[in-house]
């Protein structure tokens, strides 16, 4: 069962959460408009591959840690992540402030990506999705509320 809302009011408009959701949705719609082979190329190019990260360290492969957070593998993958970000992100953004929240979001995504890379260092399967960053937001919500 998916939650639809929480009962904690906020004092500020969650502009960072809204922007992250809008960016992810726009990128997914772009992915959806592509041919299968083109979408596969995008995921292969911009998804984070642990093996590449360790074998060929460099700016391009480090960039994929962040670019992978905006790609999603399907409609339910996107909806699940964005729903949880919408419900819980607004309270964390309100508590932290916009700039700190954005940094926190990316640090959570970075920590999740590096954790995955350390567990599966030989994997050349692209890791995509905002799940790691959103999990960090959800964890902080559980700690605060």
Put a short name on every predicted segment.
Residues 1-145:
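A detector for small-residue-rich transmembrane helices and their helix-helix packing motifs
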């Amino acid at each position: 069962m998916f939650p639809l809302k929480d009962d904690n009011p906020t004092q500020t408009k969650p502009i960072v959460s809204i922007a992250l959701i809008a960016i992810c949705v726009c990128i997914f719609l772009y992915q959806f408009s592509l041919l299968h082979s083109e979408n596969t190329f995008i995921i292969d190019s911009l998804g984070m591959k642990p093996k590449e990260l360790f074998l060929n360290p460099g700016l391009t492969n480090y960039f994929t840690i962040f670019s992978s957070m905006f790609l999603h593998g399907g409609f339910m993958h996107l909806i699940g992540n964005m729903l949880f970000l919408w419900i819980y992100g607004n309270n964390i953004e309100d508590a932290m402030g916009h700039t700190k929240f954005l940094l926190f979001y990316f640090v959570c995504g970075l920590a999740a990506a590096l954790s995955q890379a350390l567990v599966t260092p030989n994997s050349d399967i692209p890791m995509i999705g905002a799940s790691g960053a959103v999990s960090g937001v959800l964890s902080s919500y559980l700690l605060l509320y």
